[in-house]
């Protein structure tokens, strides 16, 4: 109550910020008259002036009013668009590293030009991040005219581009691209073997469009670069026969033995998207697998040798019970393609991890692709937190403001609309069954059609959109369907969705990137005429004018009919997605309306609020076809959505806490990798490693401070001879001296190792040998890092079981991950030292041959794939990995298998030698993992 009272007096934080920014807008507006008087050349010259002032130490904040005024004037001249005052406020919000919530149609693309221009003046690069290649290319080409006029260069970073093109794109002042491509480039840059093979510069400033979609919806899904691992194709096919033979148990057994309505072999937890075998299910599965010869008679599925089979059983069960065709995936050209549950788009090239995708392929009887081994991975949460400054814009961020602040430290500012909104959001209507709901939807659509009002119908799955399309055909209502299957025609359909009597069915409208203009999009049609070279210029002008006149008439006609009407056929788990659908209507002060039609069969209602609403309907004795339309029910649904959002936030936060562990380790490895690439000579590093490894070997047989009776000299001699190519007569030394110490033996072995090393260097030359050492070191680091990622993944899968032993799983994960990391660093030192000491080199040519062999060892990883696998929704673990035992054994002779391709990535923030080590040990970096470098 006190908070509300104080807000009335002082206003909310949002209002205070907007008020503060309005003062700066007044300063910018005051400059407009003098900026307007400048010639084009003088206006362009302002960029050079600003750059010089920044180079002289003037801050961007101080430059903001002038730079924004120049950008606005340039936009007016080049794009024929002048930024509104509220757009200037949006630009300031982005410049100060916050999230701007701007309603659909308020011109987010134009708003971004202000902070992008200002920050590009510093010359450190600005990234504009969009959700797909189409939008990246469209926005870059559209806004490049403005930036080029102002003397700035623009690059586009698209998937499938050549290495040189990518380097040029990143070298530009402003780079447009997708979140996936920026992330993959960062990972690839940390897999290269030459410094000039990198493409990214330091991560300076990013403006993220549709920030909620990228930083929240996709936060649970890591970017994964993977290569092929072992082949289990036959096993997936055989396991596919199991789920149809098992029955689902209805109800869950309680402590008193009650609760099971119908016994069965497995239970489904739809809320957590998991499936579990019951006791009888285990017995039945074991019996069937024994009959098929997959396990021995009387063997348990939990026997060590059958753990892999257990994994396949659960993958097959999940594929059959939790993942449904045309809802979670489609089958296209003989492949299973994932459907993004938030946007309804097809995610070609992405695969579910942990064998789930292969299980779905087996279920659909299409070709089963090989499983993969993770080479590198990162989540968007950790990638975007590496930027020195991050900002974002979206139409719907306020519901997730807490999460943006908690995880990314980003404040959300709601920007006022340029014109007051006129959309009417009607009460939800809830029906008992899906049939009654669809009947009501068809009635509403018919009513709008007869009145000439355009309708956009939102569905949550392809299956529902096709069902509704079928019902509309039966009702004789012409319509367009916009879902993942119609990707190519998408922009054209959206452009015309605002015409009179137009009916458009769409899976979730998030990230579509095209405004629905009342009366249709005349600009798009005009662009087609403009691009047609066969039409004479005067005829073009006449046709375009006629087009605009027709549009004016249609525009007024649609406004009179009530504007665009939005119909939601189901509530989404997230209020934000519902708001995105609603936000398509009422753009820039146009009229519009929205209504959601729900049924008690909807997953959200059934899982979270069904019983309560059903009891209300039963008490009211609602006749068939009658709907509930009450605030209490709508509030009940919103409460259910809030619960789901809170649960999803907890999942993302928990995931981040686990991922932070591997992220800290990734920072150490990538920093050391970059230091290796940039160092001219790594002799000191190699020498320190050799001395450390030799010391460990000697201490095994001749402990520090020990006496002769405790030594095992014959074993030491054998170990040095077999493993390190050092043939030393240590026993003779001991026999000849009556007072030799353990330290003297260590010194003798170390000296012999140094002499052997120097002899090899002398044979081929310092420069050649140093290049060989760098190659060995990089390959070893990469291979052992891959195996470490697999080990972390296996650790992550089973860590929750520590809770049963009254231990904190997160703390246990951190502790064991640190131990694994320390073991990996030791293994790197051992492996590199062994290779360098064992390699037999007579000439520089032989050395080159050895280096080539090292490169070729990565052959089994040549089929590299880039994935953004939705493992969280699949209930699958973080990385799609199969243990690389084969990869480990292949390295026993000379060196481990290696990456065979180079590529992109950004510079790691440096860890100072006296800073705390990022691994979390509490020690200084130089005394912990910094020892490696």
Swiss-Prot record:
One of its GO terms (biological process) is protein transport by the Sec complex. The keyword tRNA processing does not apply. GO terms for molecular function: ATP binding; metal ion binding; protein-exporting ATPase activity. It is found in: Cell inner membrane; Cytoplasm. The keyword Magnesium does not apply. It is a peripheral membrane protein. May bind 1 zinc ion per subunit. It catalyses: ATP + H2O + cellular proteinSide 1 = ADP + phosphate + cellular proteinSide 2. Zn(2+) binds at residues 917, 919, 928-929. It comes from the Bacteria. ATP binds at residues 87, 105-109, 515. Keywords: ATP-binding, Cell inner membrane, Cell membrane, Cytoplasm, Membrane, Metal-binding, Nucleotide-binding, Protein transport, Translocase, Translocation, Transport, Zinc. Pfam families: P-loop_SecA, SEC-C, SecA_DEAD, SecA_PP_bind, SecA_SW. GO terms for cellular component: cell envelope Sec protein transport complex; cytosol; plasma membrane. Its main location: membrane. Its cofactor is Zn(2+). Its EC number is 7.4.2.8. Monomer and homodimer. Part of the essential Sec protein translocation apparatus which comprises SecA, SecYEG and auxiliary proteins SecDF-YajC and YidC. Part of the Sec protein translocase complex. Interacts with the SecYEG preprotein conducting channel. Has a central role in coupling the hydrolysis of ATP to the transfer of proteins into and across the cell membrane, serving both as a receptor for the preprotein-SecB complex and as an ATP-driven molecular motor driving the stepwise translocation of polypeptide chains across the membrane. Belongs to the SecA family. HAMAP family: SecA. This is Protein translocase subunit SecA.
């Amino acid at each position: 109550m006190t908070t509300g009272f104080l807000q009335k007096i002082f206003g909310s934080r949002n209002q205070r910020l907007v008020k503060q920014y309005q003062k700066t807008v007044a300063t910018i507006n005051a400059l407009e008259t003098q900026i307007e008087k400048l010639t084009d050349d003088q206006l362009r010259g302002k960029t050079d002036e600003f750059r010089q002032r920044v180079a002289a130490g003037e801050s961007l904040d101080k430059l903001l009013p002038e730079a924004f005024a120049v950008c606005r004037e340039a936009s007016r001249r080049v794009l024929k668009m002048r930024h509104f005052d509220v757009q200037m406020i949006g630009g300031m919000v982005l410049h100060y590293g916050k999230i701007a919530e701007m309603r659909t149609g308020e011109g987010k693309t134009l708003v971004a030009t202000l902070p992008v221009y200002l920050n590009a003046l510093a010359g450190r690069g600005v990234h504009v991040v969009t959700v797909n290649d189409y939008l990246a290319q469209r926005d870059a080409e559209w806004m490049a005219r403005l930036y080029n006029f102002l003397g700035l260069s623009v690059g586009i970073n698209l998937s499938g581009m050549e290495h040189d093109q990518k380097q040029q794109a990143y070298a530009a002042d402003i780079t447009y691209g997708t979140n996936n491509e920026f992330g993959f480039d960062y990972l690839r840059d940390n897999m290269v073997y030459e410094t000039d093979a990198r493409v990214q510069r330091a991560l300076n400033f990013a403006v993220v469009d549709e920030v909620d979609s990228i930083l929240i919806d996709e936060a649970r899904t890591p970017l994964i670069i993977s290569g092929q691992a072992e082949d289990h194709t036959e096993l997936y096919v055989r396991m596919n026969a199991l789920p149809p033979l098992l029955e689902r148990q209805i109800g869950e057994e309680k402590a008193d033995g009650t609760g099971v309505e119908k016994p069965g072999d497995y239970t489904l937890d739809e809320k957590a998207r998991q499936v579990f075998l019951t006791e009888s299910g285990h017995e039945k599965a074991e019996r069937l697998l024994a009959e098929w010869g997959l396990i021995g008679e009387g063997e348990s599925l939990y026997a060590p040798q059958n753990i892999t089979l257990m994994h396949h059983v659960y993958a097959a069960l999940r594929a059959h019970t939790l993942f449904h065709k045309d809802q979670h995936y489609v089958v296209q050209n003989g492949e299973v393609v994932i459907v993004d549950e938030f946007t309804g788009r097809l995610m070609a090239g992405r695969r579910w991890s942990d064998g789930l995708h292969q299980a779905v392929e087996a279920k659909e009887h299409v070709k089963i692709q090989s499983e993969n081994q993770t080479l590198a991975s990162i989540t968007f949460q950790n990638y975007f937190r590496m930027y020195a400054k991050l900002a974002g814009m979206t139409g719907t961020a306020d519901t997730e403001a807490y999460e943006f602040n908690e995880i990314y430290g980003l404040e959300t500012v709601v920007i006022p609309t340029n014109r007051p909104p006129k959309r009417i959001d009607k009460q939800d209507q809830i029906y008992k069954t899906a049939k009654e709901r669809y009947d009501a939807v068809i009635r509403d659509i018919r009513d709008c059609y007869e009145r000439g009002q355009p309708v956009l119908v939102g569905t949550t799955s392809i299956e529902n959109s096709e069902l509704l399309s079928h019902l509309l055909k039966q009702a004789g209502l012409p319509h367009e369907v916009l879902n993942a299957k119609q990707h190519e025609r998408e922009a054209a359909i959206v452009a015309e969705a605002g015409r009179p009597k137009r009916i458009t069915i769409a899976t979730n409208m998030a990230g579509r990137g095209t405004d629905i203009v009342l009366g249709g999009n005349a600009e798009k049609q005009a662009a087609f005429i403009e691009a047609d070279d066969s039409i004479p210029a005067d005829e073009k002008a006449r046709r375009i004018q006629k087009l605009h006149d027709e549009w004016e008439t249609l525009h007024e006609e649609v406004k009179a009919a009530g504007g665009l009407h939005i119909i939601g056929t189901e509530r989404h788990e997230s209020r934000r997605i519902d708001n995105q659908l609603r936000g398509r209507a009422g753009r820039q002060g146009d009229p519009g309306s929205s209504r959601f039609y729900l049924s008690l069969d909807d997953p959200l209602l059934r899982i979270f609020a069904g019983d309560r609403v059903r009891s209300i309907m039963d008490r009211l004795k609602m006749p068939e076809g009658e709907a509930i339309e009450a605030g209490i029910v709508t509030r009940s649904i919103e409460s259910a959505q809030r619960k789901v959002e809170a649960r999803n936030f907890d999942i993302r936060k928990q995931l981040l806490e686990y991922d932070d562990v591997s992220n800290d380790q990734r920072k150490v490895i990538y920093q050391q990798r970059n230091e290796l690439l940039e160092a001219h000579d790594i002799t000191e590093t190699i020498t320190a490693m050799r001395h450390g490894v030799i010391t460990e070997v000697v201490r095994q047989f001749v402990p520090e401070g020990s006496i002769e009776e405790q030594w095992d000299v014959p074993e030491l001699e054998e170990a040095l001879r077999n493993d390190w190519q050092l043939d030393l007569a240590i026993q003779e030394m001991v026999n000849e001296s009556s007072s030799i110490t353990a330290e003297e033996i260590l010194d003798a072995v170390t000296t012999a190792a140094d002499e052997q090393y120097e002899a090899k260097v002398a044979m081929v030359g310092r420069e050649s040998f140093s290049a060989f050492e760098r190659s060995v070191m990089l390959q070893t680091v990469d291979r052992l890092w891959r195996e470490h990622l697999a080990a972390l993944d296996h650790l992550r899968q089973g860590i929750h079981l520590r809770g049963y032993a009254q231990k904190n799983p997160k703390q246990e994960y951190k502790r064991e991950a640190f131990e694994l990391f320390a073991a990996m660093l030791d293994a790197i030192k051992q492996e590199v030292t062994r290779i360098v000491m064992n390699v037999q080199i007579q000439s520089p040519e032989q050395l080159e041959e050895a280096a080539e062999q090292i490169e070729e060892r990565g052959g089994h990883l040549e089929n590299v794939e880039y994935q953004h696998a939705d493992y969280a929704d699949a209930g699958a673990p973080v990385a799609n990995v199969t243990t690389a035992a084969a990869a480990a054994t292949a390295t026993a002779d000379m060196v481990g298998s290696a990456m065979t391709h180079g590529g992109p990535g950004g510079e790691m923030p440096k860890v100072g030698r006296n800073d705390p080590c990022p691994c979390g040990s509490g020690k200084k970096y130089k005394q912990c993992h910094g020892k490696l470098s």
